[in-house]
């Protein structure tokens, strides 16, 4: 993996972000999210910004490492690959050296569990302005994300795909 080639530094998206110091090829694992796994009822701080949902009621907490700083983008260059209670960040395409690594936070979140939303600051051409649970993304984007295998099975299930209110 690429852990030794990642640095945390100031970001235009969030206060800090994860950047690569080398070119990263397409479709490869970059790093694993390594925090403690919690059930929804065990979360020490349910509002911590570094929580990552990895199952309907399962979360990975902050690790104190680079994975705590990966920012959101509505046009991401990475995806979060979730298998069981493990989450690994993969490149979606070739990522040039010096680039910030991002993934779409909505691809791992179901609003039924964490009931959160936040203002988006990615400034991409695809910016949705608000980040929230997967079911609130427009249906065309939901289908694209599912087709490209960008969402874990607990989210891709047809009963979770709903139109926005």
Label every model-predicted segment.
Residues 1-83:
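Catalytic cores of histone-lysine modification enzymes
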């Amino acid at each position: 993996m690429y852990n030794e080639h990642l640095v945390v530094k100031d970001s235009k998206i969030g206060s800090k972000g994860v950047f690569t110091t080398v070119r990263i090829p397409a479709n490869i694992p970059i790093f694993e999210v390594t925090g403690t796994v919690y059930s929804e009822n065990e979360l020490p701080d349910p509002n911590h910004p570094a929580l990552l949902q990895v199952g309907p009621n399962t979360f990975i907490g902050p690790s104190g490492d680079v994975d705590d700083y990966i920012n959101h983008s509505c046009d991401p260059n990475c995806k979060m690959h979730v298998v069981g209670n493990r989450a690994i960040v993969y490149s979606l395409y070739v990522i040039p050296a010096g680039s910030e690594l991002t993934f779409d936070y909505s691809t791992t979140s179901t609003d039924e569990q964490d009931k959160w939303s936040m203002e988006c600051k990615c400034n991409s051409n695809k910016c949705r302005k608000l980040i929230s649970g997967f079911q609130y993304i427009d249906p065309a984007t939901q289908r694209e994300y599912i087709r490209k295998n960008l969402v874990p099975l607990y989210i891709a299930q047809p009963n979770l795909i709903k139109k926005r209110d």
